[in-house]
């Protein structure tokens, strides 16, 4: 039972509120006007091309039977950074291996030093061991990148960021006994990471 009389209030739509805030370029382009991005929309960082050889350091070793894309890059609180690749990458493996990001960045710094013409002592030691084994490494043609080992990574949603976040942090490869889905393996390839298969534990 309603004890109030209902009267429809008069409503007037004032589109001026929207006209002042939204640019409508239909029929009146302004090519000289610069596009302004929001504070959390960033360009993708430049990625190095694959070289003839690759020096890889495994920075995360995951022994779970399956590793999901949600473990590789969590959803939820990270969604607000989906247009900020570097900021989003800070959450990579945060629930599975919180130290991963720091270790991956350290390896990326080695490659940046190599590109700048400096070989850190850690890399020199590896090259010396390779030369002793009969190899002749060429620093100019050898990327240095990080990698993860997981038994079966990539299960779950087709989350492209599960691969792109690794790449942004300097990821160059993954090692796995098998890949949970073709789409995750394909995403790794599309982002320039080599999806190696390992028949034994590394």
Protein language model regions, located:
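Fe-S-dependent hydro-lyases/dehydratases of central metabolism
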Residues: 1-200
